[in-house]
Amino acid sequence: MHSEDQKMLEYDTFTEAYVDLIKRVYQRPEHVCSPRGMKIHEYLGVTFKICDARNRLPYVPERNFSIAYFIGESLWYLSGNNSTEWISRYSSFWKNISDDGSTANSAYGSRIFKPHDRIAATVDNTWTQWKYVIDELINDQDSRRVVIHIRSPQDSLLAKKDVPCTLTLQFFLRQDRVHQTVCM
């Protein structure tokens, strides 16, 4: 971002953050580049806070926002499903970016709510990253280790079209409130 913008940005709502950041990146991009032939504008290292986390649905009349798709995608993530068949009822986007036509590599829910293969095989077949978040916050309310890993090393090698842009979700329990930091 430009030097005057190098601070923590604060917004009351998700919509306010979304609209302001879209305007900033299009009107004053820090970088313009073309990964995989797609021209993009970008800022690196943007940090912002949404003060009213309950007001988290984007309301931007100019944008084609489908509440049915939003609900469907949320349920898909929460179910731990990464099959494109189910979510494609709401949008063909997922089948179009799938590397194998049937699996969405970037379906966060599968990575968060399903048992991790390597850990399940060696330690605990019920262990999930979400279970770890809950257990760790209960056992150590001051923990800084409560991290969900979304992107894995295999994504860099195996996935070609569908790679998660989110790297980690980190949770903190402070003053009886859960705070989340997302690294993308």
Regions found by a protein language model. Name each.
Residues 1-184:
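Terminal, non-catalytic protein-protein interaction segments that mediate quaternary/complex assembly
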